[in-house]
């Protein structure tokens, strides 16, 4: 199927520059890379770009904690991110940063055009302010209950449960993430992007049929609830770009983050000395195609704000958004305690990149479904598909070709019809890659692999090799097997770049999509070397354990009271249940003659009196002040004979000791003798 060459620009969502890349990130970058590699195989001109999202208060505060500048932190993080993506063979043409001169200029240009066109509004707003830290709180530094779906523990700008966006002031019971304080309201002038002005355009875009059905349906819900003006400014202190002619005001990170796609491409064009391509891809009437691969948590920003910003500043809109779901591990959310919150670099210390690329690809479709990385299934599938079906097809035939025929393949196909079955599948498999129905493509390829192995099983070259006068048959059978292997690896080339390199070295030819129409006949292959090793659960166990150890190593140091007085070893509930805690009324309190630490307390347990000696004298120099208070005592502690008498229990107190001892008291309404449960 001949295709007209297209110009395509592909992006992935920009990773935030305050943390490492993990397997959740890798789903998107692998999905996009497989699609990009397929497009390149079909002869299209593809520019594949990304960048670090490097602005915002979280980066500013983390840099402060580390004692370095934000610029130093994002520089180090960029190197780490690029190393991880290179390790997974993500074929970016350029990886940049939103903290760049290109991005600053483009952000100011888009803002100025929006302002000139009347889409920027100014007004004074009441904003959440942390009274303890003395700063306005960014959206992500306020948490509370979502005002839409009532889910707790949601950020101040959007809900990760229902996807809604809102103002931090709309949160129910907000708290400052920085200090834990309840924020107060303060006035500040802010700049707003007039999103409602683009409602008609956005609805037409939604109805165009290009967007995934789930995305279009979600957008329709947002239209029905009404679009709101979008706050695009933040107050100092803030790490980002200052808004022109507005001292102390900065672009909100979500304004300049998507512009980072443009900034990265501009940087690529400048590196190439190409002053023309930027406009060819981004001008209003561009015929190039623009695709954003993103997660479902940022659909709102990419489907509403971003196309509206582009429309309002006279740039082209995306051709489409390709949205994916989240990654779970072993059926549950990634967990640091269980060792399933796995960093990309940790994975590469235990497995190759192709294995994860294959597993994710086999599970992906064009729908926005979550993907479960079941580690046991991962091992089984990689061994069954890559090793047993594909690589084994080459290994079981290559030995005979190398040893008996000096690596030269037969001059004719043993089964031309079977070969045609394989090459005819190119259209179905190609369409599956094109439409991002990756799981379907893998199923089609593995069905062909089963056919190929069945052919070899039926022809039994190991038997033919022992029969005199059948050398030509042996060469033809094994050459057929190697040619089928070549077709399979061509179809898998977008998924398995490193295995493809080894396969191409063995086959002594480059694997191209159109090349499979001509089988390798009379062609000399190289000596066969192991192409891929089996994996096992011991590697998985080591991976999980390593992830747990990383969490321990990077855990925040314990501060406060726990640093000096750590929590004791865990006890069972049965152990705890043996302790009988009761409310007691302090009827009398007095000094103990001969002791500078003890007070003698007379306690009423609601019908029973107890005499207790307690080492709280330094904290309560006036024992009479304790009379009439309620406290908590251990009622079933064995009596202890002391020099001053018998102590018949223990009262509960908190604090490190000395003057810092605080007698515990129950809430109002508790009566002497009540059990504490």
Curated annotation (Swiss-Prot):
GO terms for cellular component: cytosol. The lineage of its organism: Bacteria, Pseudomonadati, Pseudomonadota, Gammaproteobacteria, Enterobacterales. Its cofactor is Zn(2+). Binds 1 zinc ion per subunit. ATP binds at residue 336. One of its GO terms (biological process) is methionyl-tRNA aminoacylation. Zn(2+) binds at residues 146, 149, 159, 162. Residues 575-677 form the tRNA-binding domain. PANTHER family: METHIONINE--TRNA LIGASE, METHIONINE--TRNA LIGASE, CYTOPLASMIC. Is required not only for elongation of protein synthesis but also for the initiation of all mRNA translation through initiator tRNA(fMet) aminoacylation. Its EC number is 6.1.1.10. A motif ('KMSKS' region) lies at residues 333-337. Pfam families: Anticodon_3 (PF19303), tRNA-synt_1g (PF09334), tRNA_bind (PF01588). The keyword Zinc applies. Homodimer. It catalyses: tRNA(Met) + L-methionine + ATP = L-methionyl-tRNA(Met) + AMP + diphosphate. GO terms for molecular function: ATP binding; metal ion binding; methionine-tRNA ligase activity; tRNA binding. This is Methionine--tRNA ligase.
